[in-house]
């Protein structure tokens, strides 16, 4: 029995959490573990404490039970897909109140902030890592759907360099549990509503190509994007469209979340964008990273972010 299952076995009240602005991997891993525990362990009080994810993940069993509030009575905290305490947001306080804590993560920038830490940065996703810690014979269809979703999203539908033979084998084993895997990919990764598609077109129309075509960036202020969509999560995927432009090595997408506050997303083909994100106070992976920055957008770009990108491109 590995450390995760040992801690679950010995706990009564369990809180499962993940990073702020939960994506497919964070949502999938937290709900996968929730389903696995509730289906295989008796007498456990389990709560998923997480910012409400995008409604496109409503199909995952347990989605409607997610609570944004900390679970103060938890004697075990399981953190999934978060690289440091700050990424847990207000739910980070549970690290102080829970008797035991364990972090399961695949980010190279992980700070080993929990009492116990299982971090494997070579994994495509936290869902892939979590799969290796669970008993396959006890993985239900509900759990498999969650795990598969996370792997699909963090591997870029199996096209990022973090995808390995084992990633594909695990995905295949999950598909064997029996669910419509093509619908998951289509509905949660590719499909966008009309206004979100129009917003994507606006970003691409106004995007800038610099540094001999090796960097492409797009910007949105708060009033612009809120004029098209009601949820920032509907901008997921814009950064990938910038990265997919021929010749681009590093893509940048920055949008305003509040006055003088901006979310920065970075993607690359070969360059290490995690170092750039870390310098900006964020984190992530070598090929996919992000941060939240404060200041005027044009000043941040000209004085800080673009010089960092140029330096990384020049080696």
Listing of model-derived features with the role each one plays in the protein:
Residues 59-116:
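Active-site cofactor/cluster-binding pocket
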Residues 24-30, 85-89:
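Short glycine/serine/threonine-rich phosphate/pyrophosphate-binding segments
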Residues 104-170:
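Short alpha-helices
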Residues 69-71, 93-96, 110-111, 139-141, ...:
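Solvent-exposed alpha-helices and their adjacent loops that cap or buttress functional pockets
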Residues 33-34, 94-97, 119-120, 169:
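Glycine-rich, phosphate-binding/catalytic loops in enzymes
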Residues 20-22, 82-85, 107-109, 222-223, ...:
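Short glycine-rich anion-binding loops that position phosphate/pyrophosphate groups of nucleotides
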Residues 17, 21, 79, 103-104, ...:
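Generic enzyme active-site microenvironment
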Residues 2-18, 28-58, 68, 73-76, ...:
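Hydrophobic helix-and-loop "lid/oligomerization" segment in the mid-to-C-terminal part
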